Amino acid sequence: MAEKVAVIVGPTAVGKTKLGIALAKKLGGEVISGDSMQIYKGMDIGTAKVKPDEMEGIPHHLLDIKEPCEPFSVVEFQRLCRALITEISARGRLPIIVGGTGLYIQAALYDYQFSAAPSDEAYRRALKQLAAEQGAEALHRRLEAVDPISAARIHPHNIRRVIRALEVYHCTGKPFSEWQQGQSKRLLYEAAIVGLTAEREALYRRINERVDEMIAAGLIEEARALYDRGLRDCQAVQAIGYKELYDYFDGRVSLDEAIEQLKQNSRRYAKRQLTWFRNQMPVKWFDMTDAGQFAAKVEEISRYVAGKLQLEANI
């Protein structure tokens, strides 16, 4: 019998973390982070990582497991997440994956075989050199020209994934998005996939407010600590919230410009996340626009998940 898994996805700042904790309390669950940046130590504020005193006693997994310059891939996430699903289920608890990194979550839930993808080391090195000389945006424009679907899914600053998509196109003549569609889409688990959304104006307002809160909480100092350690070429510091402040530390933009760029990049990322989840996974959507209705939404979503997975719930 397939193991049961609840999944909470959606754009940044929509309230996934808070709902994940509430759902875990209702359904006897443990949270697995489905965020590719929250795995890194020392990157707490910029990744909106849940604080220990906010967890309300709910175990959280796949947080703070890597140093910022340690490599981490979707393949490793797939392995770790699946192992955790088995461990949590064996304890009689419900695994609840919470996050916004769609490809990572999809890879864990579905029968994806990444080892089948072709590779060309020399071509990869050439693309890395191109990125170093012309910048991440130039590399992303190249991907847009041959595979606009993958370009929409992959952030321009995620150089490693942009290169991987270009590499697959180079080796196969097929866009990476088309190659992925040829992969098995068999769901390995009995899953209830919940998506959180909000009206655009409300979501963008929350994003802007959260950036201001991050700045007040010490994001500049957090990013500066990474900068002062000489961490410049790591995948981690290309994340939204750090790349923009690195430009400020380098003197290329003012602090106000960096903060405005951070807000804009976060809003664009939220839009890409929504598009991806709507097109790639069988999601049951819930509107979280009215923050005053959070408790009612917790009840509604708990009932949906409990019904879908045939669980006994504390409702």
Curated annotation (Swiss-Prot):
Q: Which UniProt keywords apply?
A: ATP-binding, Magnesium, Nucleotide-binding, Transferase, tRNA processing
Question: Which GO molecular function terms does the record list?
Answer: ATP binding; tRNA dimethylallyltransferase activity
Q: Which top-level group of life is the source organism from?
A: Bacteria
Question: Would I find Protein biosynthesis among this entry's keywords?
Answer: no
Residues annotated as binding ATP: 10-17
Q: Which cofactor does it need?
A: Mg(2+)
The reaction(s) this protein catalyses: adenosine(37) in tRNA + dimethylallyl diphosphate = N(6)-dimethylallyladenosine(37) in tRNA + diphosphate
Biological-process GO terms, alphabetical? tRNA modification
Residue ranges for the region (Interaction with substrate tRNA) are 35-38
Q: What is its EC number?
A: 2.5.1.75
Listed InterPro entries: Dimethylallyltransferase (IPR039657), IPT (IPR018022), P-loop_NTPase (IPR027417)
Give the SUPFAM superfamilies listed for this entry. P-loop containing nucleoside triphosphate hydrolases
Enzyme's top EC category: transferase
Return the annotated site residues (Interaction with substrate tRNA): 101, 124
Annotated residues that bind substrate are located at 12-17
Quaternary state and interactors: Monomer.
Task performed by this protein: Catalyzes the transfer of a dimethylallyl group onto the adenine at position 37 in tRNAs that read codons beginning with uridine, leading to the formation of N6-(dimethylallyl)adenosine (i(6)A).
The entry's family comment says: Belongs to the IPP transferase family.
Q: What is this protein called?
A: tRNA dimethylallyltransferase
